[in-house]
């Protein structure tokens, strides 16, 4: 990962409490997993930032390196990597994702 790409990722994570690196946008997810992630986040009724990795190949590869996770989408809460769509769904079904967001908003 080059220094400039690392800086971009760090800036995105620094400037946003909840970040979803995904394929496509909130309004037009470009894969089923990104769509699942968006649906989960929309259910939480909170603000979140999305980054379309299809717009930048360097970010697309670097975010996988940054998280040591091979797939997209990737959710970060308070700079911490949470997981992809399956982990998000599992945490959501257990009420843990909502709890993480509520803790973040209460801080």
UniProtKB/Swiss-Prot annotation:
Pfam families: Glutaredoxin (PF00462). PROSITE patterns: GLUTAREDOXIN_2. [2Fe-2S] cluster binds at residue 31. GO terms for cellular component: chloroplast; mitochondrion. Signal peptide: none annotated. It comes from the Eukaryota. InterPro entries: Glutaredoxin, GRX_PICOT-like, Monothiol_GRX, Monothiol_GRX-rel, Thioredoxin-like_sf. Glutathione binds at residues 23, 60, 85-86. The keyword NAD does not apply. Residues 6-107 form the Glutaredoxin domain. Keywords: 2Fe-2S, Chloroplast, Iron, Iron-sulfur, Metal-binding, Plastid, Redox-active center. It is found in: Plastid, Chloroplast. One of its GO terms (molecular function) is metal ion binding. Belongs to the glutaredoxin family. Monothiol subfamily. This is Uncharacterized monothiol glutaredoxin ycf64. It comes from Porphyra purpurea (Red seaweed). The lineage of its organism: Eukaryota, Rhodophyta, Bangiophyceae, Bangiales, Bangiaceae. The gene is ycf64.
């Amino acid at each position: 990962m080059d220094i400039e790409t690392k800086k971009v990722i760090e800036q995105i994570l620094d400037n946003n409490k909840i970040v979803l690196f995904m394929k496509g946008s909130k309004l037009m997810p470009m894969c089923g997993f990104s769509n699942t992630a968006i649906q989960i986040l929309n259910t939480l009724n909170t603000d979140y930032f999305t980054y379309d990795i299809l717009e930048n190949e360097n970010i697309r590869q670097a975010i996988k390196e940054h998280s040591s996770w091979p797939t997209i989408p990737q959710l970060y809460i308070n700079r911490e990597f949470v997981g992809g769509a399956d982990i998000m769904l599992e945490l959501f079904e257990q009420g843990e994702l909502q709890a993480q967001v509520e803790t973040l908003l209460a801080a």
